[in-house]
Regions:
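A solvent-exposed interaction/effector surface
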Residues: 1-150
Length: 150
């Protein structure tokens, strides 16, 4: 995660220098994750209201994210617990006979992060695991509020 959070200030500086408005929370889209090789390819993203165009040699690119269904897991607390949160999402997929989709993005959205509070217990990260589209499933998790997975 240290590499991820080193890159966010660079992206924010680009936004400031070019008067680009950010309309959402910072996020990471995981493009490729090689577990045996312990290598990950990812994109640092900030949401903007309209598409921009950058020069071909720019480190910054712009694109659109298509809608897809996903299992959402909310991690409250330090990022050191993210593996456990991801594992719970994958376990939920297995327990409910859902199937992971190869067309959606695996993402983390940093709803409340280190730039807003230095208290890790207050950090909120939303994890999205893409699944094959089905009708929305209403679920109720013990000691939680009801939610709809879309």
């Amino acid at each position: 995660y240290s590499k991820v959070f080193q890159l966010f200030p660079k992206m924010q500086l680009f936004f400031e220098e070019n008067s680009i408005k950010n309309i959402g929370h910072p996020m990471v889209i995981f493009d490729n994750y090689n577990v045996p090789g312990n290598k990950v390819s990812f994109s640092i993203c900030l949401q903007i209201p309209e598409e921009i165009f950058t020069s071909p040699d720019s480190e910054i690119t712009c694109g659109k994210r298509l809608n897809y269904q996903a299992v959402k897991v909310t991690l409250k607390g330090d990022y050191s617990h993210s593996k456990e949160a991801w594992d719970k999402g994958f376990a939920y997929i297995k327990a409910t006979n859902l199937q992971e989709s190869e067309t959606g993005n695996y993402m983390e959205i940093y709803v409340k992060n280190f730039s807003q509070t230095h208290r890790p217990s207050e950090w909120i990260t939303e994890i999205y695991i893409p699944v094959i589209a089905t009708s929305p499933i209403k679920t109720e998790v013990p000691n939680s509020t009801p939610s709809v997975i879309e």
